[in-house]
């Protein structure tokens, strides 16, 4: 009966001009007809037509086979395991369990306990020697206090590693598994795998650069700082390499997001060019939401580590900048100030790389997709496609692809500008304090010289009276 009424209505519509309300009614009838036809084809509950499937059935062997992200970035994961920074493990092939796991009693974690204990002994010995040397020295000037604080602050990430990194191991494993699942879903939906052709050489290069740069920076401090002993350098190599490794990890993930979004955007453009792409757009919208949630999970998984990372960079940059400027004002430029400027440049470079890469990744996943969807000519597509495009845009608005440190801060270019403004404020205060000390020293020196001259004049006058 319903089919007969629809056919009669369509016959009548051919012979009249439709107003907008009639056209909307016609589209609704056509959509109902398609849904009824689909229900006749299967006996499932109608909820499957509007509710997203909770999980795509997958085989662990297929997950391993198509996990290009893991295979291309495996070297960085192994480096983190060797350094004891993030002891997560990859599940053996064929084992029906999450592909990346985290447990407190795994082999990787036992090794992390051991290597961390050895490194802690070295760091504590060097820290004790630095503290004892500072206490025993007679020079207690404010500048010397600042100078000693710089190299003590660099040790802070080591002591906070268990709290900042290990404690979030389960979230990191979840993030890795999200990448694995996303690649398989992408293959199912688009029919094409995601390929990361540049990540393999980039990851290997960054692994080597992380340790090479650590050696260069610490040895430069040994040669440029007058009281930096060679034995003290061994307490800093692994710390700087760890900071470099986390920066490399962030760069690799942001690059992967950019590569995935570029391939995804191309597939979206091809789908929009087809006839009646509404059903496919629904799957693409769900896939995009997964990609956005992955970016949010990256910030959540490493929130503590990168939060401390940014604080250490902020604090060390301020102290090193002040120390170098105050020494130049008081004593002139020396090799010591060059060493401090090396630290400042290094810290600001790390912050710039992290913020800039996060900005580009968010733009590629969010803004680029919005522009493609907004450029769709809605008058040239059917009503169902129009609604899907609108829902896609709403999904982008409600799930912004931002990298947020678990609610503490958004990682983007705005973080650089805010940090620089805060640094400038604190530096102005510290330099005012320094100039006040210099004025007081000059005033005291002038008074002392004046008193000495007066006493000498009085002694000369007394000698004249006696003669």
Curated annotation (Swiss-Prot):
Compartment annotation: Cell membrane
Membrane topology: Multi-pass membrane protein
InterPro entries recorded: 7TM_chemorcpt (IPR013604)
Domain of life: Eukaryota
TM stretches of this protein: 107-127, 145-165, 199-219, 239-259, 305-325, 338-358, 415-435
Pfam families, per the entry: 7tm_7 (PF08395)
Tissue expr: Carbon dioxide-responsive neurons coexpress GPRgr22 and GPRgr24 in the maxillary palp at both larval and adult life stages.
Broad class of the protein's primary localization: membrane
Disulfide bond entries: none
Cytoplasmic side: 1-106, 166-198, 260-304, 359-414
MF terms (GO), sorted A to Z: olfactory receptor activity; taste receptor activity
Any Gene Ontology CC annotation: neuronal cell body
GO biological process, one term: sensory perception of smell
Residues the record marks as carrying a glycan: 453
Keyword set, alphabetical order: Behavior, Cell membrane, Glycoprotein, Membrane, Olfaction, Receptor, Sensory transduction, Transducer, Transmembrane, Transmembrane helix
Extracellular side: 128-144, 220-238, 326-337, 436-467
Family: Belongs to the insect chemoreceptor superfamily. Gustatory receptor (GR) family. Gr21a subfamily.
Function of the molecule: Gustatory receptor which mediates acceptance or avoidance behavior, depending on its substrates. GPRgr22 and GPRgr24 together are sufficient for olfactory carbon dioxide-chemosensation.
Stated name of the protein: Gustatory and odorant receptor 22
Source organism per UniProt: Anopheles gambiae
């Amino acid at each position: 009966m319903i089919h007969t009424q629809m056919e009669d209505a369509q016959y009548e519509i051919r012979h009249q001009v439709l107003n907008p309300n009639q056209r909307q009614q016609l589209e609704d009838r056509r959509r109902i007809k398609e849904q009824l036809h689909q229900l006749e084809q299967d006996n499932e509950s109608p909820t499957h037509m509007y509710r997203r499937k909770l999980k795509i059935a997958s085989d662990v062997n297929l997950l391993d086979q198509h996990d290009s992200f893991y295979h291309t970035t495996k070297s960085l994961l192994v480096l983190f395991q060797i350094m004891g920074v993030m002891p997560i493990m990859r599940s053996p092939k064929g084992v029906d369990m999450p592909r990346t796991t985290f447990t407190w009693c795994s082999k990787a974690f036992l090794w992390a306990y051991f290597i961390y204990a050895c490194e802690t002994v070295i760091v504590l010995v060097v820290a004790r020697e630095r503290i004892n040397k500072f206490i025993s020295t007679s020079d207690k000037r404010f500048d010397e206090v600042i100078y000693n604080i710089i190299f003590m602050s660099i040790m802070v990430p080591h002591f906070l590693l268990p709290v900042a990194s290990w404690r979030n191991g389960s979230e990191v494993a979840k993030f890795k598994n999200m990448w694995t699942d996303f690649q398989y879903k992408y293959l199912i939906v688009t029919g094409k795998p995601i390929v990361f052709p540049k990540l393999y050489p980039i990851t290997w290069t960054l692994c080597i650069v992380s340790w090479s740069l650590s050696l260069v920076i610490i040895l430069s401090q040994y040669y440029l700082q007058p009281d930096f002993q060679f034995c003290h350098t061994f307490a800093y190599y692994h710390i700087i390499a760890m900071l470099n490794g986390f920066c490399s990890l962030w760069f690799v993930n942001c690059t992967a997001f950019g590569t995935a979004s570029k391939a995804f955007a191309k597939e979206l453009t091809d789908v929009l060019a087809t006839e009646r792409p509404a059903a496919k757009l629904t799957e693409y919208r769900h896939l995009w939401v997964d990609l956005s949630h992955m970016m949010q999970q990256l910030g959540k998984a490493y929130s503590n580590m990168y939060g401390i990372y940014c604080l250490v960079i902020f604090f060390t940059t301020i102290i090193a900048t002040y120390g170098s400027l105050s020494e130049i004002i008081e004593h002139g430029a020396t090799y010591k100030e060059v060493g401090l400027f090396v630290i400042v440049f290094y810290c600001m470079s790390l912050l710039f790389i992290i913020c800039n890469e996060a900005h580009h990744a968010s733009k590629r996943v969010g803004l680029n997709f919005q522009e493609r969807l907004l450029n769709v000519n809605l008058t040239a597509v059917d009503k169902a496609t129009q609604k899907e495009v609108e829902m896609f845009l709403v999904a982008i608005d409600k799930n912004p692809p931002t990298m947020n440190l678990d609610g503490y801060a958004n990682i983007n270019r705005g973080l650089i500008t805010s940090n620089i403004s805060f640094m400038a404020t604190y530096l102005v205060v510290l330099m005012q304090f320094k100039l006040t000390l210099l004025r007081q020293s000059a005033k005291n020196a002038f008074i002392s010289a004046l008193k000495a001259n007066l006493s000498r004049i009085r002694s000369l006058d007394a000698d004249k009276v006696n003669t």
